[in-house]
Amino acid sequence: SAKLCVSAAMDEDETVIQYPFGFGLSYTAFEIASAITDVTENAITVEAVVKNTGDTAGKEVVAIYVEAPQGMLGKPSRVLAGFAKTQVIAPGEEEKVTIVIPKKAYASYDDSGVTGHKDSFLLEAGSYKIYAGADVRSAALAGSYEQELQVIEQLEEACAPSEQFERMTRDADGTLVYKKIPAREFGPYDRIEKPEEIAYTGDKGYKLADVYNKKITMDEFIAQLSDEQLIMLFHAEGMCSPKVTAGTACAFGGLTEELRALGIPATCTTDGPSGLRMDCGTKAFSLPNGTLIGCTFDLELAQKLYEMTGYELRRNRVDSLLGPGMNIHRNPLNGRNFEYISEDPLVTGKMAAAQIKGLGIVGSTGTIKHFATNNQ
């Protein structure tokens, strides 16, 4: 079965979402019975028994949603905190699924200091209800537990908005309200430390392979390079560079004879999240787009799919795939949503990690892209 990794369409009164997050059809039917089996300082464990009550073998998604107390920060009604996909379950058979959820997965961020812990991820005190099921609406209560105020991670302000605006949040009673965001206290460059300068030594005869073989350090290798060589090292050539595989997106690295003489190869990349784009007549496999992969909620399947893509990259002498796409579906009109996985950051992150892992298994890699601010 496949499930929506986005929510879509309101009813005529625009009060009820017709297709909630996690909604999907199957050729069979399932029952899910769940319970919280352990709560520790940093994680909770939920066990679910999934039974196939239909006539056809199939897989099912078990998603864990958390309803947190509104507290002073305001929370979504429910937030996805973890998920798993069963193996194929025969009719009448069942499978036990155990999901361990780090508490950080449903912590809230306090950017104003209203809790007394500014710039931290934390859990506000109160009762936390845990639900298990496929979609966010039909998921059944697995249990609840009482949580004391707990700071999960203390951070520092780095890049807060420069201008204040109002954002929608909830009061303690759940009422939707608009409140101004806190004013910036530090600029984005205030805390950036300048790196130590490496003294230029000139050509010492070192090759990049000497770093790999631990004969020299990377700093010693870099010290050989002039400013002009360093600039060229980070300069890229666009589509169809003659220095790499024909028809690919860009080349970078060893683009000059001097850099190649140091053992720095010209590195090749190509688009993208829907498979290799080769604008030269070379044929390649087209992949399901990011959103369709997200709808599977199947990390194992995503990893295996990208293992295959990794082999295809190597066959075409491409070093890095320009993907997966990491932007989330903030706006349904975003022109490149097909490249992105979900409106949910957890699904997006886990699916993208599975894809990168699949590429890496066969010695390829990917470039996670459009992490934010690419709403075209």
Regions found by a protein language model. Give the residues of each.
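Glycoside hydrolase catalytic-domain context in secreted enzymes
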Residues: 1-138, 155-376
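Extracellular and select intracellular beta-sandwich modules with Ser/Thr-enriched
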Residues: 139-143
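Short beta-strand edge segments in extracellular beta-sheet folds
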Residues: 144-154
